[in-house]
Amino acid sequence: MTDSPDATTGGCPVAHGDRLPHPTQGGANTHWWPNRLNLKLLAKNPAVADPMGEEFDYAAEFKTLDLPAVKADIQEVLTTSQDWWPADFGHYGPLMIRMAWHSAGTYRVSDGRGGAGTGQQRFAPLNSWPDNVSLDKARRLLWPVKQKYGRKLSWADLMILAGNVALESMGFETFGFAGGRVDAWEPEDDVYWGAETTWLGSDQRISGGEQRELEKPLGATHMGLIYVNPEGPEGKPDPVAAARDIRETFGRMAMNDEETVALIAGGHTFGKTHGAAPDSNLGPDSEAAPLEAQGLGWHNSHGTGKGADTITSGLEVTWTSTPTQWSNGFFENLFGYEYELYQGPGGGWQWRPKDGAGEGTVPDAHDPSKKIAPNMLTTDLSLKVDPIYEPISRRFWENPQEFADAFARAWFKLTHRDMGPADRYLGPEVPSEELIWQDPIPKPDHELVGPAEIAELKGRIAESGLTVRQLVSTAWAAASTFRGSDKRGGANGGRIRLEPQRSWEVNEPDQLATVISTLEGIQESFNAGSGAKKVSFADLVVLAGGVGVEQAAQAAGFDVEVPFTPGRGDATAEQTDVESFSHLEPSSDGFRNYLGKGHPLPAEYQLVDKANLLTLSAPEMTVLVGGLRVLGANYQQSEQGVFTEKPGTLTNDFFVNLLQMGNTWKATDETSETFEATDASGQVKWTGTRFDLVFGSNSELRAVAEVYASDDAKEKFVRDFVAAWDKVMNLDRFDLA
């Protein structure tokens, strides 16, 4: 038997040196071919990994909760200090706020990934980020509550609810709480956290010298931090420079300057940071901790390793004189003193009032007889020295109620932004106010169309003069904005007719305007004469796409009916935040053979990323690409990948011709983004892109393509395409779930 792993490194107990890993330790294929396409991203959270079973309905279970009783149980946890991890100031509230914040604060608006929605803080890498030191203890403190309520309360909901209860228990009135977050059972490996291979590294993500350009889509300036280094950029204690980093990272979380100030000041009204000694005293993180640690990381060899000896960030800062009560104390101390830089007991840069001011005004976290001075982080002082943050901070200081309202709203946004529309919110504390960042969609105020009216509308669409390509590409443009990450986008709302979507390059604005005008004419005419039953523009776009698919299938010899369920609403321009929706604009869309400029990864990787956001499986991605190609849905009617002599006909020709032996593919230029296939005579037969050729090149995708290229697959291809198409059209129909 081998020796146990080195506790200082958290090393693997199986000594393999330079050997390939055992399958239980990871895949050898990634070692041999590190650039291989990772199609496991299209098989997230498989049913076989879910101990709750496929029939489990979390929403139904959550609705049976006695939420006040749950909150009372959490309150009991907050005020019952445990010897194994004593509470600062006798109250775990600040720890729970940090846990909830760090659960939600990984969200980034650019791709909707991160956030609190699936309880990812329980898994690597988040459970072991340097910024999450000791949050394993917060979750263990909550285990009795989770154990009591079991299936009725997810960890994802519990972590956010605990943050809310913590605020309320310390005298703050929150804006509301919504449940509905469903736990995942594995790490979300589809999130790109950065290229650095060392914790707190920033050398790969920061470029541009003093301009400090942060790599997209990242939301933090250092690997393993939620936002920024609290000591300042790369540990340099410069509040002015830190303000730039704060603005960039909070902006990438969809927070404006006022929300940013409110969040930082509100969060730092409570509790303290921990840096009793240098972090060299800490052992391996949670994921690397030895077996006997049972998932608790960062064993602290300094003193008792807890209480007054705790080490987390390595900074030792308490901001206010009432760290377990809501107050305006943060701003009072921020503006009430001039600060000087010094190194705290943990060796980190922090700030204290000059000339010994403030001594004896702040309580010690564990010794009631001891009083200390308030301290500040470099990033706290940014709120005082930055020309934009300073007047906001001063206004909040002078208007405490305005500050409280701003923090309540910003906290609710922070903890709910990744949940999608308010239709997904559960529980008695859901606020009634409509917020624009929720992408509100009015519910239809009319009777929905039935089978007879649907048939009539389909006839009008078919006679409108719009082509299969126009019908299909418009419906795809509307529906494919959906992101499974934060549940934004989709056809519901009919925002394809509004800015910014109607002007996106990928949507070919001139052609789109024609389709919109034609469909609006059909809608107006129908609604004027249909009595009580009416159709929304959003419904009409999806119905029209289905008409296009049906026409193409019929041309191929198959009589199919594309499913259609009315009930979508039409949003207004006033309900649409143009800046926020700009983040949904595709910079590439392999389904339409559209590739923008400036991408760090080859096209096929972007296709998989897009399919992941659309929650597609590898077969669904494959059949949709093959179908959309022969339907002519390419950007600007490009011939790339249209491997058929019968465009507009829903055949399996894409796969048949791609896999046809005897053709020779060659890149058309040094970029290797477009290719030509020549036959034995040397004549160019087809042209294609990386989006296309990957289905013949990648061994896994080729295996799927072979299914659809087979002689007996013509009908299967059509049926599978319709099923995948219908899935995409309804991804945002949370009312149907």
UniProtKB/Swiss-Prot annotation:
List of residues binding heme b: 268
Keyword annotations of the record: Heme, Hydrogen peroxide, Iron, Metal-binding, Oxidoreductase, Peroxidase
Cellular-component GO terms for this entry: cytosol
One biological process term in Gene Ontology: hydrogen peroxide catabolic process
Covalent crosslink: Tryptophyl-tyrosyl-methioninium (Tyr-Met) (with W-101): 227-253
Cofactor: binding comment: Binds 1 heme b (iron(II)-protoporphyrin IX) group per dimer.
InterPro entries: Catalase_peroxidase, Haem_peroxidase, Haem_peroxidase_sf, Peroxidases_AS, Peroxidases_heam-ligand_BS
Cross-link position per record: Tryptophyl-tyrosyl-methioninium (Trp-Tyr) (with M-253): 101-227
Tagged with keyword Transmembrane: no
Name used for this protein in its record: Catalase-peroxidase
Native organism: Saccharopolyspora erythraea (strain ATCC 11635 / DSM 40517 / JCM 4748 / NBRC 13426 / NCIMB 8594 / NRRL 2338)
Biological classification of the source: Bacteria, Bacillati, Actinomycetota, Actinomycetes, Pseudonocardiales
Gene: katG
